[in-house]
Amino acid sequence: MEFDRIYAEVDLGRIEENMKAMKEHLRPGTKMYGVVKTDAYGHGAVPVARTIDRFVCGYAVATVDEGLKLRRHGIEKEILCLGPVSAGRYQECLENDISLPMFEYQRAKELSDAAVAEGKTAKIHIAVDTGMSRIGLFPDEGSVEIVKEIAELPALRIAGMFTHFARADEADKTNAGEQYRRFREFCDDVKAAGVAVPVCHCSNSAGIVELPDFNMDAVRAGITIYGMYPSDEVKQDIISLKPAMALKSFITYIKEIGPGTEVSYGGTFKAEKTMRIATVSAGYGDGYPRNLSGKGEVLIHGKRAKILGRICMDQFMADLTGIPEAKEGDSVTLVGRDGNQEITMEELAEISGGFHYEIPCLIGKRVPRRYVKNGKEVGGMMCRDEEYEGF
């Protein structure tokens, strides 16, 4: 596949290696959900889901539409929607066997009624708020009674119960430990009340890496699938992860500018000497952070080149000083390795004032994804949601 502007390269082999590393670290018998929300953190939900299928018991998404896309492309294992779902989407969820989070009796009653009307059984996971203050029942006696009432509703099956750590990615695990204790006790109380809960899960990526004692029945692997650690406070010598995505562009034009020449919008960069600069075919319209303007660097022929002036929607300029061999058509690495140099998602996030999870998620739909494994291209190039030929 030929690319003439910008593309993201996703290494499915590295994703497999990351899954193996996590799987080997889990306690025996612990299952794993693969979190593929936001199009698998920008990596492509369908190719990623198919790649990790043998490692997981199911998938976690954030929206109904994300779950439906997986079903349309033949994903058969459990799909758990982690975010709240309105009653207007219940029929689609029932028809496509999508498990829903549940944290209010009235919501459960509406889902039960819809399931009875459709002649189907709805699967739910009880959401428990142990410290995130997002969604979920508080882990108290009153909530145990609510879960009992929900469990008695017709055409509804409790498939699991979960909570989410708010601070497991910090060096101090005190908060995560307290959340785990609350959740563990609530799970025990619910089961003691006669409610069957097949799967209890609380550990996110940070929990998988550093808190194996909190694994419970299942864990939810997210950012670690894609080769990134949740934060720089999470130890990186426990599980070896490899970044799965690179972002590459091209030099489309080279020119020489003289002293006093301004570069890009606002003239925020003005040349102090004669310079050779490159125009690169990528911009914030592709999801490349505009906040890298005048601060970020790219790799050309294994050397770092500074971004000059403001990043435009579709293009930006870079300094070719010290890279005399650069020519039009040459590859430009925005994220990834070139020779002995590497630019990571974490570096881009730090320089731009963002969050490293954001960087791959923001890479736009107009950026083709090239999938590779063991150095060879697999599947096909994808630029739009439904283009999954070859997978």
Question: Which sequence ranges carry the predicted segments?
Answer:
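Short secondary-structure boundary/capping segments within folded domains
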Residues: 23-26, 269-271
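Active-site anion/phosphate-binding pocket segments in diverse small-molecule metabolic enzymes
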Residues: 1-16, 31, 39, 66, ...
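Active-site-proximal beta-alpha core segment in soluble small-molecule metabolic enzymes
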Residues: 2-10, 14-17, 24-201, 214
